[in-house]
């Protein structure tokens, strides 16, 4: 029997016009948007799904980076998420958003993925404007509409 997340993922794939996507044996489903934004969905449990945006490698050469990330995380928390987290296996910074499955639709999932993508763009630009670059072979500053972003926003 399929989980609620699997059923939603099937309907989401149909809505956006791709053949089929599914969760792997680790209950993760990863895909790229415009070959720039890497998103992973986690079938965490039957109550919610997690949406992760892969931002890039954690730069260890900038002493202010950790403090800036804490500042950004507070701002995101005050404005409805997503939250910043660290994935030790890939040594990468992620944006994570909890997506409740009650009353979930493909449209709602798409909207919340868009929140994560816009938050990734904003985070990347604010950090870039402070001289901090996340190592990410896919997300290039030239590919994101450039601006003078100095403040974080949650993409909502």
Swiss-Prot record:
Main location per the UniProt record: cytoplasm
Matches recorded under InterPro entries: Tir_chaperone
Keyword Cytoplasm: yes
GO biological process: protein secretion by the type III secretion system
UniProt signal peptide: none
Highest taxon listed in the record's lineage: Bacteria
CC terms in the record's Gene Ontology section: cytoplasm
Pfam family, one: CesT
Assigned keywords, A-Z: Chaperone, Cytoplasm, Virulence
Subcellular location(s) per record: Cytoplasm
KW Nucleotide-binding (keyword) present: no
UniProt function note: Chaperone for the type III secretion of Tir. Probably stabilizes the protein, prevents inappropriate protein-protein interactions and aids in secretion.
Family: Belongs to the CesT/SycH chaperone family.
Protein name: Tir chaperone
Organism: Escherichia coli
């Amino acid at each position: 029997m399929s989980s609620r997340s699997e059923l939603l993922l099937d309907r989401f794939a149909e809505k956006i016009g791709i053949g089929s996507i599914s969760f792997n044996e680790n209950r993760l489903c990863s895909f790229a948007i415009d070959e720039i934004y890497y998103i992973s969905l986690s079938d965490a449990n039957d109550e919610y799904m997690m949406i992760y945006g892969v931002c890039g490698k954690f730069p260890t050469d900038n002493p202010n980076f950790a403090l800036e990330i804490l500042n950004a995380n507070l701002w995101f928390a005050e404005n409805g998420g997503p939250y910043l987290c660290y994935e030790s296996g890939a040594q990468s910074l992620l944006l994570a958003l909890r997506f409740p499955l009650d009353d979930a639709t493909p449209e709602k999932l798409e909207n919340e993925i868009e929140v994560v993508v816009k938050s990734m763009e904003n985070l990347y630009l604010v950090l870039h404007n402070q001289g901090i670059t996340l190592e990410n072979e896919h997300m290039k500053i030239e590919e994101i509409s450039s601006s003078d972003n100095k403040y974080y926003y949650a993409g909502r």
